[in-house]
Amino acid sequence: MFLTMMKGKIHRATVTEANLNYVGSITIDEELLDASGILPNEKVQVVNINNGARLETYTIPGPRGSGIISLNGAAARLCQIGDKVIIIAYALMEEKEAKQWQPKVVFVDEYNKIVKIKEKEIHGQTE
């Protein structure tokens, strides 16, 4: 049996662009993609902390070190510049692997610069 497990997460990123006239996707600073283990073109869930909206899209790498988090296409209707979002990728794995799995959780500051990287989440802690 395969389980769907959190693979990587970028926590409380700030939306820097919302481009309605783009084909689709979310553009993410390549440094954040690498740190979180999320790949270009990978399916992600985006959770908007400001309004509770949840959406699925795919990633496009943005310029390394730029801090870009851009919701593109229809997703731009669900996020505004300045909104805080959580970006999550999932992976399918066998139960045996899932029990040992440690996802990458990337915490960023208000400029989307990496503050800390953890391999697990603890209830009640935002960092």
From Swiss-Prot:
Q: Name one Pfam family in it.
A: Asp_decarbox
| Sorted UniProt keywords | Autocatalytic cleavage, Cytoplasm, Decarboxylase, Lyase, Pantothenate biosynthesis, Pyruvate, Schiff base, Zymogen
Species of the source: Carboxydothermus hydrogenoformans (strain ATCC BAA-161 / DSM 6008 / Z-2901)
Cofactor requirements of the protein: pyruvate
The protein here is known as Aspartate 1-decarboxylase
Q: Which GO CC terms are listed, alphabetically?
A: cytosol
- Name the EC number(s): 4.1.1.11
Listed under subunit, the entry gives: Heterooctamer of four alpha and four beta subunits.
Tell me the function of this protein. Catalyzes the pyruvoyl-dependent decarboxylation of aspartate to produce beta-alanine.
Q: Organism's domain of life? A: Bacteria
